[in-house]
Amino acid sequence: MTPTEVTTSLLAHIGKRAPQCVLPLPGGRNNRVWRVDCSTEAFLLKSYFWSESDPRDRLGQEWAFLEFLRSIGSLKAPAPLAKDRSTRFALLEFISGNPPQELGESDILDAAEFLAEMNAQPAFAKNLPSVSEACFSIQAHLETTAARIDRLQQIQSTSEDHEKAVVFIRDTLLHLWHELRKRIEALPDSARHEILAPSERCLSPSDFGFHNALRQSDGSLRYVDFEYAGWDDPAKTLIDFTNQPDRVLPDNLAALFLEKTIPLFRNPYALHRRLALLTPLYQIKWACICLNAFFPNRPFDPAHPLTLQLSRANVMASRAINEIGKTPH
């Protein structure tokens, strides 16, 4: 079915007439999106990536999380309107706005409030799945990053940019990885393999950051892209938010975000300790994710400038080096 045909069917489910216009929009890494104009209303049509090698149910995961947010009265995310599981299309509320250019303390407080809001009534979310790549032990966090490091070593020197990436991986990233892995593996087995109690987990948008926020005309923020959302270790959620390569937070705003969010969760002392241990690990993981640009693109992936992605990987590696320097051996 074409996007227009799917849209017509989904609009009929919510009692709307056929669309006047279905306009493709710049998409994300794992989906395609269209603006749908219907009379005086606008909607968002979203197509979710799926393949035999990556069969994650992105539509189901996002839909369940958006329904949960609506059930607790949150209006910070788009309303889910209609879906077609057979074609992996969904019709969502269209949020008009642009990614925020300037960030201030009020934006940090807004994001912290959104995280608090979704975690205030966990009983409503007991049936939600875990996030994609959820990790509930130190060992699981380590193994997830190890898998990405191993994959990076498949990159070949097929161009000048690829050669620079290979050199960076060999001379910087692998040395950093080996040092950090040695530190973590020096922990007692019981500490590395201890499973985080369900009561200490959090609900997370997963890909949470200002790169997935839209500033509306009144200055307020709303958030999009919940296709990996679910239960997670709050340490991972907080680290990812402050270290998104697209929008790395300056130190003062990152500190404010942690100040406002750490008390939201049970056992903040243990959370502080996990943050200190896992922050450089996830900065290394983000460097690996940036370097995915050096692999052949998946069908939905936009082409990322290789020099930009290598620069971002270098930034993440530098941040990891700084974090490791803060922590005594």
Predicted regions span which residues?
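Residue-level signal for well-ordered alpha-helical scaffold segments within enzymatic catalytic domains
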Residues: S9, A64-S71, E93, E117, ...
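ATP-binding pocket architecture of kinase catalytic cores
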Residues: L23-P26, N30-S157
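ATP/Mg2+ or Mg2+-diphosphate-binding catalytic cores
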Residues: K164, C288-H329
